């Protein structure tokens, strides 16, 4: 959520900043509604003052044994007006809140301005793209002999986009997750296994709704709707909603492992088959609550952790500074870490690390008290540390051998009983 006071003060400047993300944004209706709401509040306060004055006159009239009927009628008329004003005010405030809730975060000044991902800027490349002496296979082809994934059986139970891991695929997945969690703990992150279902107001607080309403799996629990989380960012942000933190306790670094659920699997087309785009996947999420002064330090820390992971896994990767047209709704700046997938002949995002400023904390009402006792909204940051499906794809495709076997990265071997290679089933 943006600060309405800044929009009132600098409407043209705010509109121009928002149009960098979405050129169709106009603040005209919002400003008109805001003006109406403030006028209604002022009129209501005037009526309340008038009613109070009349009530005083009624009391005096009764003490003096005078006829107070006209005064009482005046008070009753004001009461009727106030009821009408209150109804109109509630309606106008709801409309204003909805408009405010649909405005994205302002992009930082150093973010490239572009309508889409074509404006993304590669800021770092690391590692060599592998060259093979044989035609490299897509991970779905590799799996035909490895048999560590199953796409057909879960399609029976759940539909397309819901793969299952099996055999050594399970062990490799858990090796990855254990390695990732250990890495987060080593860097001072508090580990969490949080709930997977959240209330609607928690989705609102993280910025998922109302902008993307209808894109999440929903469960009806009596009179309350609960939503399966698309990312642990949602629940970690919600942990401190409507709280006042102490400045000396900041920054707070959290890391959570969760399954994540998204309805848009398959949106990338048939070429993104297999694990590249799915409805359910595992992810370790990093999240931080900071002061504005701590924000950049936390941001670089998160980026550094992601780079350390990809370097230790010896995967070729690049860092991309996302343009305004490719950034998320809540982010003011995002850097994507992208790994090379030989099966796609392209780099694919495995982590997005974003600064959100006070955008989420205004929605969640998460503040901190400084040494002088003054209250401020916290800054929030989030980043994948990492999502495993594409990471697993990257390992299978980059470490594949001509015979269809896959070498296990050295960093993961301690978590797989020092196993060094995945062999095709026919070779076992």
UniProtKB/Swiss-Prot annotation:
Enzymatic reactions: tRNA(Ser) + L-serine + ATP = L-seryl-tRNA(Ser) + AMP + diphosphate + H(+); tRNA(Sec) + L-serine + ATP = L-seryl-tRNA(Sec) + AMP + diphosphate + H(+)
GO molecular function ontology, one term from the record: ATP binding
Gene Ontology cellular component annotations, sorted alphabetically: cytoplasm
Keywords from the named record: Aminoacyl-tRNA synthetase, ATP-binding, Cytoplasm, Ligase, Nucleotide-binding, Protein biosynthesis
GO biological process assignments: selenocysteine biosynthetic process; seryl-tRNA aminoacylation
InterPro entries per the UniProt record, alphabetical: aa-tRNA-synt_IIb, aa-tRNA-synth_II, aa-tRNA-synth_II/BPL/LPL, Ser-tRNA-ligase_type_1, Ser-tRNA-synth_1_N, SerRS_1_N_sf, SerRS_core, tRNA-bd_arm
Assembly mode: Homodimer. The tRNA molecule binds across the dimer.
Function: Catalyzes the attachment of serine to tRNA(Ser). Is also able to aminoacylate tRNA(Sec) with serine, to form the misacylated tRNA L-seryl-tRNA(Sec), which will be further converted into selenocysteinyl-tRNA(Sec).
Family as reported in the entry's similarity comment: Belongs to the class-II aminoacyl-tRNA synthetase family. Type-1 seryl-tRNA synthetase subfamily.
Protein name, per record: Serine--tRNA ligase
Organism the protein comes from: Chlamydia muridarum (strain MoPn / Nigg)
Top-level taxonomy: Bacteria, Pseudomonadati, Chlamydiota, Chlamydiia, Chlamydiales
